[in-house]
Design a protein with these regions (language model features):
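Nucleotide-activated chemistry modules centered on ATP-dependent adenylation/adenylyltransferase
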Residues: 2-281
Length: 281
């Protein structure tokens, strides 16, 4: 490992990839494994217990490859902290310091407390377990997602964005994962095939509770992933005064709207990614 002089003195560099197992971070890992473009010592995943099953299957599929390559893997479980923050944490008003509510409720929106929890856990791990190193952190943000860099800008690691350096877009990252056999298949009884591919119906495979999902994504979840829609309804029932998408757009109101609109036929006419990959070869 190389050495770098900085405010902490001279420490050997330790190269960590911070991943979510979405298309960006997964494609970054696949490229790093295929070609030694950058050094990689460890992969770190902060698990909030709010990921789609298909996303965790991508993790399980790649872990043996990391082991074969001698790359360490660390998973930080903050699922209990996530639920505490969602339901029980006293939330203070930033101006007055007074407690004005209990629990953050929905993650996403203007208060990205879920992201804050993940970053806090990640950097606590770096400080506690890897303080003897200068951490070089690889983050799987694509070139058309550069604004996301700001969420990672205030921490003490040396940050690298390989996909931005390589000019990889989100669409290219998804396609690259498909070409390597990673499809984010989610089981469902809503279609005859018994499965859907998350990146065909969602823009991002983020936390299934995230209120940042757009109406198209939510409609697809309602019709194609009823098991996750039930979870959204349960959370909405726990916070009835906070509509998921704002006034007049609670999960229950959106359900009525989606039923009135009807489902989109095009959702069921799509060519599954595995078949599409064969056709394009």
């Amino acid at each position: 490992m190389g050495k770098r002089k900085g405010q902490n003195g001279t420490k050997p560099e330790y190269h960590c990839a911070s991943v979510s197992w979405g298309a960006g971070s997964l494609y970054m890992l696949l490229k790093l494994l295929e070609e030694p473009l950058l050094k990689l010592n460890m992969v770190v995943f902060v698990n909030m217990g709010a990921d789609f099953t298909a996303t965790l299957k991508m993790r399980d599929k790649l872990l043996p490859e990391l082991a074969k390559s001698g790359i360490a893997y660390k998973e930080i479980d903050v699922s209990k902290e996530f639920l505490y923050d969602m339901y029980e944490r006293p939330v203070k008003n930033r101006e007055t310091g007074e407690i004005h509510r209990i629990g953050h409720s929905w993650c996403g929106g203007p208060c990205r407390w879920g992201t804050g929890l993940k970053l806090q856990a990640l950097y606590q791990f770096y400080r506690r377990e890897l303080s003897q190193y200068t951490i070089v952190e690889y983050i799987g943000i694509c070139v058309d997602e550069e604004e996301r860099q700001y969420y990672n800008a205030q921490n003490s690691t040396i940050k690298r964005y390989p996909l931005i350096e390589w000019g990889i877009t989100k669409r290219q990252a998804v396609k690259g994962c498909y070409e390597r056999g990673f499809f984010w298949e989610e089981e469902t009884d809503a279609v005859n095939t018994g499965k859907v591919y998350l990146y065909e119906i969602l823009d991002n495979c983020s936390c299934f509770w995230c209120r940042n999902k757009n109406l198209k994504e939510l409609k697809n979840i309602f019709y194609l992933l009823p098991q996750y829609w039930d979870r959204l309804k349960a959370l909405q029932a726990d916070f009835p005064d906070e509509p998921m998408k704002g006034c007049g757009k609670s999960v229950f109101e959106l359900e009525k709207r989606f039923i009135e609109e009807g489902r989109s036929v095009s959702l069921f006419d799509m060519i599954p990614p595995p078949e599409r990959m064969v056709e394009e070869m």
